[in-house]
Amino acid sequence: AESKSGEINTFVVDTVKVLRAKVNTVKLGNAHNVVWDKKRSYLYATATITGGVTALFRFKYDGNRSNPKLTNQTRIYTFDKESGGHDLFPVYGEEDKLWLTAASAVYKFDISTDVPTCEKVYSIADIKSICNGPDGILMLKPTEEWWAEGLVNEKGEELFKMDGAKIYKGRWMIDNLFSYPEKHDFVLGED
């Protein structure tokens, strides 16, 4: 997702030839973060729509490795007043749940049905990234523009700091089984 250009792009990727040029584009205002749902074969993304509010979108991926496309764009949730949808990431330990950070709060989506439900979890503004794991919640709250020198928990307690760093996202190093299989198959190019 490219927020400045408002696009979600697909690329042809080859493990031998590396990255090629983008092949297809979906316009989506201030597109931020995408998450693959391997169980349903959906791609989720946040964007800003008319009126400046944040919405959650769902796409299908056509599976074409030589000309990949996102299809069936569906807006599945629209906030009444929330703006600035930013991070979107699976909730560790809770099936069918996604974190979403926005301008004024952190939310949790339940996507187990076609019409997701949304719950405000933390009334903390401007969180740039969130994830959770066995060791708790990890957030990035910027101290300069869009970065910080460290990471905090949901109480604002510092968990990690590196002087001079410009950290944009923080993640626990744990398996993301919402998006990826337990075992990855290595596929070489087919030329």
Predicted features along the sequence, with ranges:
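Structural signal for beta-propeller blades
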Residues: 6-9, 51-56, 106-108
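Short loop/turn segments immediately following the C-termini of beta-strands
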Residues: 2-5, 48-50, 61, 93, ...
